[in-house]
UniProtKB/Swiss-Prot annotation:
Keywords: Activator, Diabetes mellitus, Disease variant, DNA-binding, Homeobox, Nucleus, Phosphoprotein, Transcription, Transcription regulation. PROSITE patterns: HNF_P1 (PS51937), HOMEOBOX_1 (PS00027), HOMEOBOX_2 (PS50071), POU_4 (PS51936). Residues 328-344 have a biased composition (Low complexity). It comes from the Eukaryota. Changing Q253P: No impact on interaction with PCBD1. Reduced PCBD1 recruitment to the nucleus. Reduced coactivation by PCBD1. Transcription factor that binds to the inverted palindrome 5'-GTTAATNATTAAC-3'. Binds to the FPC element in the cAMP regulatory unit of the PLAU gene. Transcriptional activity is increased by coactivator PCBD1. The gene is HNF1B. Residues 231-311 bind DNA. Pfam families: HNF-1_N, HNF-1B_C. One of its GO terms (molecular function) is identical protein binding. Transmembrane segments: none annotated. This is Hepatocyte nuclear factor 1-beta. Residues 1-31 are annotated as: Dimerization. InterPro entries: HD, HNF-1, HNF-1_N, HNF-1_POU, HNF1_dimer_N_dom_sf, HNF1b_C, HNF_P1, Homeodomain-like_sf. It comes from Homo sapiens.
Amino acid sequence: MVSKLTSLQQELLSALLSSGVTKEVLVQALEELLPSPNFGVKLETLPLSPGSGAEPDTKPVFHTLTNGHAKGRLSGDEGSEDGDDYDTPPILKELQALNTEEAAEQRAEVDRMLSEDPWRAAKMIKGYMQQHNIPQREVVDVTGLNQSHLSQHLNKGTPMKTQKRAALYTWYVRKQREILRQFNQTVQSSGNMTDKSSQDQLLFLFPEFSQQSHGPGQSDDACSEPTNKKMRRNRFKWGPASQQILYQAYDRQKNPSKEEREALVEECNRAECLQRGVSPSKAHGLGSNLVTEVRVYNWFANRRKEEAFRQKLAMDAYSSNQTHSLNPLLSHGSPHHQPSSSPPNKLSGVRYSQQGNNEITSSSTISHHGNSAMVTSQSVLQQVSPASLDPGHNLLSPDGKMISVSGGGLPPVSTLTNIHSLSHHNPQQSQNLIMTPLSGVMAIAQSLNTSQAQSVPVINSVAGSLAALQPVQFSQQLHSPHQQPLMQQSPGSHMAQQPFMAAVTQLQNSHMYAHKQEPPQYSHTSRFPSAMVVTDTSSISTLTNMSSSKQCPLQAW
């Protein structure tokens, strides 16, 4: 007779025989173990199974479990040898109590799976659970297995004791038959429906009580224990096929109408049926996984809430980053960043506006150490009409904010007056200077026409609060070696003997826009800060003529 044992079982028997155990001793040991009630499964006559022993015509289920249990211990299964740490699950007790033909078929199927590779069986069960969206919690509730151990066994092939695998395989076999009956429910006519199909209908309507119906001859004690614990209803879980359909619909319409939701219900149920390998006409067999219009509505509502929450988080993060980036500028002052609350005489840069898109920003910093002064120019003037400047306002940008640029405070007025006359003019020229707002240029020019040049510097401020400052004589050149006086940048100028006008000419040549033929228009004068003009008395007439024709860009400090 050809042996029905697997190669591993044959190796185990060979190892037992080679260890000195005789056939008679082995058979006697098996007979002593068979009546043991430890596993709660009685001896029953079953068809020949792969785990059969020496007697091929009569094979009890318990003998199969015993052989598998021994094999599990040798392969490193967890738990004690006698299985006292794991009570017999109700599902095995039900299998013991059933005497129907269906129960015999289930036991035979469990025996076949126990004789196969555990990892192969685990992958098959995992794939079936994913196909039908069955959660592991349902398996845990029915079999009593530890969910962590079950997850490791299904995902990584962690060894599991044979008794536990028998409970898992029993659940798998029964679940297959249960789902098959659900999809075939409407095939049977209501007139010819038998008692068994009536019980199946009850199980379909109440899937949380998915316990196998008991035979008529079964005692009440056998079925009392499984019904004591109420099974939890399976929570609805969206399948991957339905989620793909819903996300595509969400991209098209975030709040679909009722008709659109009903169309999505049909499409999702069809996809779920195709995923399970059944006809879409049997969508009722999905049971707790049946997609309804209410579930589709809730899904879209949850997606909209999630999207709104993510947008709020993004806005909060952006606002927080903006606040953190502004805090160092507002709370920490530095020599290169003056606070906006500084008085006008501490500001070292002025920004003006000009009509058109072409804009040039200007800032000029002057720092002085001890008795020496050094000019550091960064650049860059916009064209400003003298008539556009109003002496009645502070140094403001067009948007009404104080401008803070790199550099220290302004040097004394006498220092400003001598910037353009260093080492090129005698001290007599530097004393015939006038410092006045732009609005007072015309008035001073008219007064100069009727009187001789003033020999004392004149300082005309906005509020009249500036005290007269005596001019300071500079006996040494204040420019740094890498900087040249502005006068040297305009060779051949007819105003070479007038230092300030030479600087004005240079700025006019470098910053006037050639393509601007018409006179530029400027913003309201109230938006521009007050500016002081420093020049000598001999040049005031020329400056007046240039300002009246709006062709002179003026430099402000």
